[in-house]
Amino acid sequence: MRKTHPVNALKKLGIGLAFGAATIMSMPTSALACTQMYMGKNYTADGNTYYGRAEDFDKRYLKHYGIEPAHEPGFKYSSIESAFEYTSNKPTYRYSYVRDHPSNWMGRTDAYSEAGINEKGVSCSATLSTSYNEEADAADHIDEKVGLGEYSYGSIILGESATAREGVELLGRLIDDQGVCTNDQIIIADNNETWLFATLSAHQWIAMKLADDVASLNPNIGSLNYDVDLDDPENCLHSEGIESMPVEKGFAKYSADGKFDVAQTYGESLADSGVNQWSRYVQGRDYFGSQLTEGTDYDIITVKKDGKPDQKGAMVSEIQPLFFRPGKSGWSTFELIRAFGNRGENVPGLNANTDGVYCIGSERNTEINLFQIRRGYDPEVATIQWEMLSRAAYSVAIPLYSALITEVSPYFSDQTVSFDHCKQTDVVYNEEPENSINYVLMDISSLCFENPDTLGISVRAYLDALQNELIEQNKEVDAAMLAETTTEGRTALANKAGKAATENTYVK
């Protein structure tokens, strides 16, 4: 996640340059640190597919869960990160979102619908920021002033798409027409298919239907390699010039068997990747039992940069795969939730608690989403959104039937709550706004990160027990949800269950 704001966008809105420059300084700046995960159903205990993402941005940064209503034809999507605009030619769909606070976006309430499910059962997690190489940049340069970007991906996908494939195809058409303003990866799913969509350069893109017998972990690396058949439209969709453009420009790369290598052609080189990224990759592979070997697959190094703190972390000997097979099957909902809190505790030299390295369960997590998809179920109930609005190392994921929810728990602070509590350094004597689970979890994690060896240990044990309780309770809710056959009845139950789970978590 980058969160960049070009000056031209402020000019376009008629704001003076002097004010615009000051505003930019107060807005979020580039933050290339998120971790995306996927676990195919063949490896899970319940036979469900799971995917999600941890967003990293700042130690105390407020996020909001809410519902965007449906709109009449003519609804306009726009952005202040670029000049992108799109007007819908049909009624839009209601969807859930996780968004930023308006105070960080000039009062805009639509910034970054990064995780949600729409009323048709389409879900998405957006975005994982990536990078492209110099040759791709020279051939098809990304102009940050124009094109579709992470400010709008989620809103467009969820507001417009009745299936995951529709979402993929719509993004592709928009990129063909307007280009993109950033390199990103997005996961889009429904009750039948899960797709990984990647923007490769300004106008080149690829989408791959994810298999049931693989896992995936990506900590912002655009060059993780994969094998894909570009001539199989059932499982792969892509821009028309994905291969012909780099061939014409002279930078196309091919594997040893003569197959066009998408990741190597467009992705950043190994030399341009960073130790913070590879540390998370090694930590994640270890968590999933598909370990890399220090001294063979990677080394632990310290990078010194002029004027910046030293960075200690992992650097691999060669580019690693985007997809792998975990070391076991039977992954549980709890284990997959906790994967986002992984701090490398079992990796010698890459334990964030003792070795000063970056990690997946970072103190800079702001929001974590995990989608549990039951293949073939009715789209209204097929997907459960497990949502954490604070740092995964010391947080709890709340289960939400977001395709049906129309009433958000009052314990989820809406976008009218003050952002000021994020700036507090002494959370013991500065209480959070009343009935705000967003701030409660933020404050708990702040205290635990300050006291990891004392408070952190006991709180994590308590939160684990609470998380398991939520998982077990939701099985009872799910049985009732599946027994209900009407949309009205399911909606009432989804609203009631979401409010109860949120309030109970807040109270406990």
Predicted region positions:
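Bacterial N-terminal signal peptides that target proteins for export
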Residues: 2-17
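C-terminal segment of classical bacterial N-terminal signal peptides
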Residues: 21-31
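A contiguous strand-loop segment
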Residues: 34-150, 170-310
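Short, well-ordered beta-strand elements within core beta-sheets of diverse protein domains
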Residues: 154-160
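Short, well-structured alpha-helical segments that form the helix of a local strand-helix-strand
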Residues: 167-176, 337-340, 344
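Accessory, solvent-exposed terminal regions and/or long lumenal/extracellular loops of proteins
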Residues: 285, 290-354, 358-363
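Substrate-recognition/cap regions that form aromatic- and gly/pro-loop-enriched pockets
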Residues: 345-469
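Histidine-centered catalytic/metal-binding microenvironments
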Residues: 449-508
